[in-house]
């Protein structure tokens, strides 16, 4: 305020002139051409088979981006050179789950058709949003491969509960949007799945890496193997990150927490590794419930997933 140099608006944050916050490099979409990466929220969680406030996640993850800088000390790289788009959120129907999923598919399909250079980063929401999002991605991009980080197969039958957060990949397989041989599941965890769904995955040619595999072989080795396999038969790769792939100590704000999961450093290294591959052109982050979280730990981890993905893409562009 003029004449009062030390008076500022209420709750004004501290500002360091030499620090750019990650949230500052995402600009609201002006409706013009999107050239590169862009966030879009899909705040649907009514389709969860357990209590979930994941519909609040897009807002909180965006907020958490402001908690971190754009500079990677590990790679001596500043993401501030990027201009990224935030397309906002897809409006969900208050009561209609199938209708909400249809809105996601319609919006994503139109955007991917009209904005062919757009590489989406979709913020769920529960994992049910991956079905319409990936279906739209496949429609626009041709033959796709999917790398799924998850504690669960998410191949539940559709008869018992309909299209919920436990069915996205079954829906993709049964609609023909995705071929089983083009789906790689990483981080599948003990006592979090059932035998019939493991057999379903095997029957359809889904490649499954359990946490035992990750611990024994290392995530980067597994990712190199998975990407090499997919590159022989797909045009692009989409990465779906269910945050419950992380151990409950690292992601307390997931509806389906459990022990024996991945640590956050391993996941972030894997996401960075995938980001460096030009075939990887889309991603979603799901199953973050801010109402269950502790000090926004899970939302902050999700924000770091975004930053490490973009770091990989930035390394690729200058390398």
UniProtKB/Swiss-Prot annotation:
Listed EC numbers: 3.5.3.8
Family matches, as InterPro entries: HutG, Ureohydrolase, Ureohydrolase_dom_sf, Ureohydrolase_Mn_BS
Q: How is the cofactor bound?
A: Binds 2 manganese ions per subunit.
Q: Which cofactor does it need?
A: Mn(2+)
Q: Name one Pfam family in it.
A: Arginase
> If you read the UniProt record, what top EC class would you report for this enzyme, in one word?
hydrolase
GO BP field: L-histidine catabolic process to glutamate and formamide; L-histidine catabolic process to glutamate and formate; putrescine biosynthetic process from arginine, via agmatine
Q: Which UniProt keywords apply?
A: Histidine metabolism, Hydrolase, Manganese, Metal-binding
This protein's superkingdom?
Answer: Bacteria
Keyword Metal-binding found? yes
Quote the catalytic activity from the record.
N-formimidoyl-L-glutamate + H2O = formamide + L-glutamate
Residues annotated for Mn(2+) 2 binding in this entry: 150, 152, 242, 244
Keyword Plastid: yes or no?
no
- Gene Ontology molecular function terms on file: agmatinase activity; formimidoylglutamase activity; manganese ion binding
Q: According to its UniProt record, in which pathway does this protein act?
A: Amino-acid degradation; L-histidine degradation into L-glutamate; L-glutamate from N-formimidoyl-L-glutamate (hydrolase route): step 1/1
What are the binding positions for Mn(2+) 1 in this chain?
Answer: 127, 150, 154, 242
Q: Which NCBIfam families match?
A: hutG
Protein family membership: Belongs to the arginase family.
Query: Which HAMAP family does the protein's record reference?
Result: Formimidoylglutam
Q: What does this protein do?
A: Catalyzes the conversion of N-formimidoyl-L-glutamate to L-glutamate and formamide.
List the protein's name. Formimidoylglutamase
Q: Which species?
A: Halalkalibacterium halodurans (strain ATCC BAA-125 / DSM 18197 / FERM 7344 / JCM 9153 / C-125)
Q: Which gene encodes it?
A: hutG
